[in-house]
């Protein structure tokens, strides 16, 4: 064991030894002699003595250890004391020697004072010169250091170094150094260019011009999972870097002792161990010095910047975090004292940047439509051969209403001289080009081109008519909708950046201003002095200062509402072009005078964009425009927007789309949602609720109404509403007035559309009038306007009601025109009308078994009809009947069409309670789903722009059907909103009244046909007056009037089954068989003589009627059987008598019929007088 090793006492072992000895041996009263005697007397005394010996040995060992430990400590104390005395003696000798040297030094100073002062001054000069040279060397490295920091996007450090460098160059020591003049000028120029660069960086980030800005926008959401995760990583990295910096600041580890400060641990160290520790510490210190010398030299200016800048971390790229990046840029501008001018430059660039973004979006949308060959629906009322520069309202009033407006007279489209115009504007039912369909399909002489035009014109005629499906189809492939989606999406991101940047700028400007005011305040306090305490000053109560009041007085320089106003202004100017708003400055025509005084045409109105429309296309076949080549660029390599038009001298346009006031319908809800969304965002960010001075409000019961009494309309919203009031509504009224007049006044208005053109689109295959289809097409278009602009329901509803009422008046006039000259009109205006209405109400029910007894209505009907023919002096003329089958089918088609129109109008415009509940449930489900999506913090990616190729079509369909994330304000109205439902409820009563009018007129047409066919029976059976039944030879052919009646009823029944449903046809012809049976008996009054051949002829008439009218008299043979049996019995007297005695009773024969039969037998003498007496007796018993 080493002698220098310090020994320690083992207290545990000592305690163990002592505890092993019994307690009685530790007591002071221990009697050793008695204990020894007891041991000696004990039988096991030997064992006891051995045990006592062991105890003694253990105690001796521990006693020796205790003595050794204390003796070693005593020796060390004596040794240390001797060393101390030795050090004290050495120190005393050194002190005496130092005192002698001090005396010698004082003597030298007294004798050489002047020389020492000279050396001291020279030393100061050298020191300051070296310091200046060091500064110059550092300043020469500043440009490279600036470029390094700027390249790494560490602009705050760059700004600090730049400002500190210029400040250093302007110090008194360096201001006159000629070698630094060029550097000073370069840094000043660098400062100005650096300001511009910072503003450009901010602009690029705001308008998402770089990939980094787009990525940064995705992570800026506070609820984004990746953003939070990134913040955690950055905080950990910062903590690690801080720890590393802290450890680097101390050159020696904390456990290492300095070689110049020996430690005393309570015991003297040997000389060898001390030298060993000193050598290890020296080696470690040298290694630290070498590592520091190998690191790059840090400039003093750089150290100053790092100590003053706590926001910027040099280890990360700040551009990955948008908010941090903008904060650092603003901080750099603050260092450069360029905040307010930068705000002015940024606000001044908004208009230019938005115009550029709009132009790029226009070009992109146009190229997408070119490359993908999308088909675009036409404007309502536009014909396929409309000119490129014509107004949208001319298409409906002057041309045959093809496309979505209607059809022309002969049911086909007007031909065009252009080789592509015949099929270019037609849209296939399944979205394919008509040229593709026409290759594989032929229907007679008609091509699928015309069929597709009809299917496109009446796209509402689907098998399952659904309101939401109809609305969803309104925004398919509308370029202006896609353009606004892209612009609104871009503007939404840009405006969010502006909001963040405005808050950062305003806070920085406010802090800077408060700092300036605080400095002024402190300066005034110092110059004015304490003065004296005021009476209002109390101890412990802080006195309000001017600095605190100044916080309220500082206004925001970067006004977000001004940004929003500029954005709305630029979008408004773009919309003016696409809405054909001639009040726009962009489209205004200003005449200019040439130097010679003549008027020039340079101010002629011209379109500014290559993309100029939404709904409309002139000549577009889905793949190529006739006026544009396959490439959207000009032959000289320039784009279509930059090409020069030879006629106007201005920028040429790609003539695919046409501006129209109809474009306001699909974009109005988008604008409303967009403006409401950004207004709400602006209010939430600024915390200043806006109020409005206007008191006009729209009354709705929903909370999400577009018009709120407390909301202020922005510039864009005011413009679109003003445009609707000023132009759009009047344009709609005039346009629909012209189109309506054309639809109801054309020669084809009351002709049905060909059946084969509707059978593949309608589950109900009954033809419908052309005018009815066109009127409902108008209602469809106006209904889409109502849904898009629900708070204009009064205006659009008035147009719908006026159009429907005018059509009702036209149909009523047409009905009266056909019915008034006829006998049907006389019967239709009597009390018979209400009986027939009751019969019509139950006609659709199950028919009972045929009965001979007439009902009260049938008796009344038969009486009124027969009275028309009981006046020989007033014979019925042929012109008092409607024998033209086309007129009869027109009445039938009008009845079905008006009833169909009434049902469709009610289905479209009347909101049922179950539908309203369904909409409410759907909205609640959507809100719950949206809340669940918002509660889940998952990363979301924004769709910037429209993809090219096939992906854009899929994304376009997805965007049309759904709305996601922050783009909820951009979207289509695939479902009716609560506002639209409430708006439609205001129209319920007028629409129900109009629908009832249509149904009443439909019933009048049906009743008129029923009466007309019964009058036909009376008219044709009047032939009995001219017929002769004293035939010399047997005749096998029926009477001519029977043949005519057969032909008339058969043709009518065949045509009516095409135009009317089975229940209505049953109502028309249900009583014909019974009526003819009654007439075949009642007309016997005109037969004065008859022989057996005449009887055979009568039987032939009945057989012919029964055979030819089988479709009409299904299950009604009983009415013809009794007549046939009666006629056949006329051949034999006995058979006749037996038959009449058996059958002459009610209800088989009525009293009137019995009287007519007896009179007929008396005149013709077919039986004996006795038989007649027998029959008369039978008649009396009836």
UniProtKB/Swiss-Prot annotation:
Residues 392-409 have a biased composition (Gly residues). InterPro entries: Sec8/EXOC4 (IPR039682), Sec8_exocyst_N (IPR007191), Sec8_M (IPR048630). The keyword Acyltransferase does not apply. Transmembrane segments: none annotated. Residues 236-262, 376-427, 525-545, 921-968 are annotated as: Disordered. The keyword Protein transport applies. Signal peptide: none annotated. One of its GO terms (biological process) is protein transport. Belongs to the SEC8 family. This is Exocyst complex component 4.
């Amino acid at each position: 064991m080493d002698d220098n090793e310090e020994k320690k006492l083992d207290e545990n072992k000592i305690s163990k030894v002592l505890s092993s000895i019994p307690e009685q041996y530790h007591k002071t009263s221990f009697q050793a002699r008695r204990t020894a005697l007891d041991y000696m007397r004990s039988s096991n005394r030997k064992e006891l003595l051995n045990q006592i010996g062991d105890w003694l040995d253990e105690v001796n060992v521990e006693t020796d250890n205790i003595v050794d430990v204390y003796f070693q400590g005593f020796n060390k104390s004596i040794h240390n004391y001797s060393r101390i005395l030795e050090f004290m003696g050495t120190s005393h000798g050194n002190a005496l020697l130092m005192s002698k040297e001090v005396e010698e030094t004082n003597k030298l100073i007294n004798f050489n004072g002047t020389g020492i002062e000279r050396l001291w001054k020279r030393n100061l000069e050298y020191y300051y010169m070296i310091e200046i040279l060091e500064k110059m060397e550092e300043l020469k490295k500043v440009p490279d250091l600036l470029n390094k920091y700027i390249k790494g996007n560490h602009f705050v450090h760059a700004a600090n170094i730049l400002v500190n460098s210029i400040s250093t160059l302007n110090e008194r020591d360096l201001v006159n150094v000629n070698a630094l003049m060029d550097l000073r000028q370069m840094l000043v120029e660098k400062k100005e260019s650096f300001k511009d660069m910072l503003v450009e960086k901010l602009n690029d980030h705001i308008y998402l011009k770089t990939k980094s800005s787009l990525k940064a926008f995705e992570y800026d959401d506070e609820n984004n999972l990746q953003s939070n995760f990134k913040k955690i990583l950055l905080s950990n990295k910062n903590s690690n870097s801080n720890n590393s910096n802290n450890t680097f600041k101390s050159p020696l580890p904390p456990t290492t002792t300095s070689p110049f400060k020996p430690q005393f641990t309570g015991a003297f160290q040997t000389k060898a161990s001390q030298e060993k520790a000193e050598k290890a510490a020296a080696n470690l210190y040298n290694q630290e010095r070498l590592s520091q010398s190998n690191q790059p030299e840090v400039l003093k200016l750089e150290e100053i910047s790092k100590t003053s800048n706590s926001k910027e971390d040099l280890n990360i790229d700040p551009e990955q975090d948008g908010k941090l990046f903008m904060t650092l840029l603003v901080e750099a501008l603050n260092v450069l004292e360029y905040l307010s001018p930068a705000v002015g430059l940024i606000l001044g660039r908004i208009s230019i940047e938005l115009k550029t973004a709009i132009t790029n979006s226009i070009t992109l949308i146009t190229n997408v439509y070119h490359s993908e060959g999308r088909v675009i629906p036409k404007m309502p009322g536009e014909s396929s051969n409309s000119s490129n520069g014509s107004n949208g309202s001319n298409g409906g009033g002057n041309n045959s209403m093809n496309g979505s407006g209607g059809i022309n007279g002969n049911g086909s489209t007007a031909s065009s001289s252009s080789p592509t115009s015949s099929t270019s504007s037609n849209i296939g039912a399944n979205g394919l080009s008509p040229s593709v369909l026409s290759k594989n399909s032929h229907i007679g002489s008609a091509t699928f081109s015309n069929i597709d035009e009809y299917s496109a014109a009446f796209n509402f005629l689907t098998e399952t008519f659904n309101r939401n499906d109809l609305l969803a189809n309104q925004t398919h492939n509308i370029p202006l909708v896609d353009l606004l989606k892209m612009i609104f999406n871009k503007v939404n991101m840009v405006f969010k950046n502006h909001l963040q940047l405005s808050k950062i700028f305003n806070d920085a400007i406010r802090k800077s201003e408060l700092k300036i005011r605080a400095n002024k305040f402190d300066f005034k306090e110092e110059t004015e002095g304490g003065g004296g305490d005021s009476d209002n000053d109390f101890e412990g109560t802080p006195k309000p200062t001017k600095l605190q009041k100044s916080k309220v007085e500082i206004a925001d320089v970067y006004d977000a509402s001004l940004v929003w106003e500029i954005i709305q202004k630029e979008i408004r100017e773009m919309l003016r072009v696409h809405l054909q708003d001639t009040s726009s400055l962009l489209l205004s025509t200003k005449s200019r005078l040439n130097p010679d005084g003549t008027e020039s045409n340079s101010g002629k109105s011209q379109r500014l964009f290559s993309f100029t429309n939404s709904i409309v296309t002139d000549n577009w076949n889905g793949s190529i425009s006739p006026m544009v080549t396959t490439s959207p660029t000009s032959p000289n390599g320039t784009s279509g927007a930059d090409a020069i038009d030879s006629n106007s001298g201005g920028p040429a346009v790609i003539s695919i789309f046409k501006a129209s006031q109809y474009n306001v319908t699909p974009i109005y809800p988008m604008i409303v949602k967009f403006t409401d969304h950004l207004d709400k965002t602006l209010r939430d960010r600024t915390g200043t609720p806006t109020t409005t001075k206007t008191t006009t409000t729209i009354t709705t019961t929903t909370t999400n109404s577009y018009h709120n009494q407390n909301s202020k309309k922005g510039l864009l919203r005011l413009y679109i509403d003003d445009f609707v009031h000023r132009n759009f509504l009047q344009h709609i009224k005039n346009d629909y007035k012209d189109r309506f007049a054309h639809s109801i006044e054309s020669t084809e208005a009351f002709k049905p559309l060909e059946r084969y053109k509707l059978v593949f689109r309608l589950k109900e295959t009954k033809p419908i009038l052309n005018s009815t289809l066109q009127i409902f097409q108008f209602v469809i278009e106006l209904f889409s306007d109502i849904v898009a602009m629900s708070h204009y329901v009064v205006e659009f509803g008035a147009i719908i009601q006026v159009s429907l009422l005018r059509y009702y008046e036209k149909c009523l006039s047409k009905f009266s025109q056909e019915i008034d000259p006829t006998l049907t009109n006389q019967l239709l205006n009597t009390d018979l009308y209400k009986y027939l209405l009751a019969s019509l109400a139950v006609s659709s029910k199950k028919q009972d078994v045929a009965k001979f007894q007439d009902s009260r209505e049938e008796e009344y009907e038969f009486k009124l009809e027969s009275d028309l023919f009981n006046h020989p002096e007033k014979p019925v003329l042929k012109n008092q009947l409607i024998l033209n089958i086309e007129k009869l089918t027109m009445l039938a088609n009008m009845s079905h069409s008006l009833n169909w129109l009434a049902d469709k109008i009610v289905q479209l415009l009347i909101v049922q309670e179950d539908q309203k509940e369904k909409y409410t449930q759907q909205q609640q489900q959507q809100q719950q789903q949206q809340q669940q999506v918002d509660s889940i913090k998952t990363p979301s990616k924004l769709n910037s722009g429209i993809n090219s190729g096939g992906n854009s079509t899929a994304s376009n369909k997805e965007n049309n059907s759904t709305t996601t994330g922050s783009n909820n304000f951009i979207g289509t109205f695939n479902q009716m909103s609560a506002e639209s439902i409430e708006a439609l409820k205001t129209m319920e009563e007028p629409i129900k009244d109009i629908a009832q009018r249509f149904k009443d007129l439909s019933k009048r047409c049906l009743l008129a046909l029923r009466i007309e066919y019964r009058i036909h029976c009376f008219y044709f059976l009047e032939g009995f007056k001219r017929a002769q039944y004293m035939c010399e030879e047997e005749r096998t052919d029926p009477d001519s009037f029977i043949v005519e009646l057969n032909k008339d009823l058969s043709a009518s029944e065949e045509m009516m089954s095409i135009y009317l449903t089975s229940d209505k046809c049953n109502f028309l012809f249900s009583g014909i068989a019974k009526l003819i049976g009654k007439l075949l008996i009642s007309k016997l009054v005109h037969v004065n003589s008859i022989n057996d051949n005449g009887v055979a002829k009568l039987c032939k008439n009945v057989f012919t009627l029964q055979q030819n009218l089988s479709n009409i008299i299904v299950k009604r043979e009983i009415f013809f059987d009794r007549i046939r049996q009666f006629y056949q019995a006329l051949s034999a007297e006995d058979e006749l008598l037996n038959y009449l005695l058996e059958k002459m009773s009610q209800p088989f024969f009525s009293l009137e019929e019995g009287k007519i039969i007896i009179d007929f037998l008396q005149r013709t003498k077919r039986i004996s007088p006795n038989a007649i007496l027998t029959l008369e007796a039978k008649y009396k018993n009836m």
